[in-house]
Amino acid sequence: MPFLFAPAMQAVIPVRDSADFFPVRRVYGAAKNYAPDIATCKEKKGFNPPVFLKSPDCIVPVQDGATYLWPMPPRTSKIVPEFELVACLGKGGRNLTLDQAKDCIWGWCVGYDFTRRLTEKDLPTGGPWDMMKTLDGGAPVSAVRPAQKTDLSNPVAVRLYRNRELVQDASTEFMIASPEELIAQLSCFWELRAGDVIFTGAPVNVPDARIGDVFDGSVEGIGSLKIQIVSENN
């Protein structure tokens, strides 16, 4: 099959402690999926978080111990680095039950869902979130840890540091819709498939980012990821 120009490269994420790579098909995300405390979380059970898609080429795998330098995009008033637990699917389907949804999870990683706050001139009036969510290099992720080697049966800590100061100290216990519930919800609207990646939402009180800021996030038992915001011309 002749191409007019080289096709885009397949987005991939390395598998931890393996020579294999996880091929990315689609990238889904969830918003407003954490409560500030357990009581509020229980009150909101049954709430379906808003969901969105990011382009697969937003995915950037970051090596363990490395700091990902991400340039502030143009025409941006501020950037919000949403640090999240990420589910990676090894199979999919439609209208999945919770048990089926759980069985779809091949592995886990951590990642940042960068969100752009647009200048007032460019802000869409009630339109889609594409300009805010699909950013060049706007979804850096760690290596994927296979689900069979991961225990998420109990809540785990989700922490984010900005310039070595702890700015988020949360737990997956504060998650309103569990990863399985998110997967089941998504499967009602799209046919999920192997290679789909799902950002499960960020804890409340996500900090703003300025040029020069260094963020270091971790999910207990899954991984950590360090980034620095740099100027566009860096």
Where are these regions (language model features)?
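Active-site pocket scaffolds in enzymes
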Residues: G201
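Catalytic-core "active-site belt" of small-molecule-metabolizing enzymes
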Residues: M1-F189, R193, V197, N205-N234
